[in-house]
Amino acid sequence: MQNNKFHYCLHILPILFFMAFVSASCIKDDQGDCPDPGTPSTPGFSLEVKAFDADGGSLGDETIKDLTLYIFDADKALLDTRNVLLSETVTLDYPGHDNLTLVAWGNGKQGAQSMPALKEGNHLETAFVSLIQTRTTLPVAGSPDDLFYGTIDITSAADASAKEFPLRRKVSGVAITARHLREYVGSTEGEYYYIVRKTTDKLDFYGKPNGTEVSYRPQAAFNDNGEFVSPAFNIFPTEADIKIDIYHRDVLKTTVIADSNGNPLRVAEGRLLNVLVDFQGAVNVDISVTDWGKQDIWKEI
């Protein structure tokens, strides 16, 4: 009887060892699906994208027609691109990435500028918003859309509760009126036009000017009062002074570089620069800076 028990134990031991091995393998496999404890990961982080004017006033989706969010990792390599809505709560969850850089552009898809076609892994510094050139001889570009821009950095220490991600206007506005221009030139025939100089033709994803210099040829026409008027149009922001060339039949007639008090023509993001050039008698130039969309109505003196 003792001998039978001994043989029974010998037979059962291999089975027990096999079961222990299988159990250990299952536990190991289960752990393999879990994140490595040594790899940091950003917990789900929520934010709301909001838009503001130059004075901090809140703007709605009647102003922001489209909104694209670009998510970059700690090395500024693209992780993801998402189309979102204004004031939508956006949750970001990218395991293994404890630092993120977010860049958002509003109205970039409205067609008056070229947005970058980024792929996963592309570096932030290779991304640009570019003007569409309409003429290469100067060169001349078309007016961009009402662009908005914002950027924010997220770290592993950031509060996971919803955070505000602000966007602000990333273009400047210009409106030009010329009085008694035909009398000054001495002709009612032929084409008149403005050339506005200069900005760069690109904005990078830091929101800074980049690229090469470009000019603008805004739409303009004579109104019923004989004033040559260019309604408000957009240009890329610039810290340099701008200049306005006035042409007739492709011949430069004059260049406006400052007002009558010597103040240079300067634009500001989210503001409208109004310029009045009066050619009656001594040439007089007035300028004013107004809120976005509020073009100055010049009174006849």
Region locations from a protein language model:
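Phox homology (PX) phosphoinositide-binding domain
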Residues: 255, 263-293
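Tryptophan-paired
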Residues: 63-118, 186-266, 298-301
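Short, low-hydrophobicity acidic/polar segments
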Residues: 77-169
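Bacterial Sec-dependent N-terminal signal peptides
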Residues: 2, 19-55, 270, 286, ...
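A sequence/structural signal for flexible, mid-protein segments enriched
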Residues: 136-226
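Bacterial N-terminal signal peptides that target proteins for export
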Residues: 2-13
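Solvent-exposed, conformationally flexible loop/turn segments
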Residues: 97, 157-160, 224-227, 267-272, ...
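Structural motif
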Residues: 48-63, 177-186
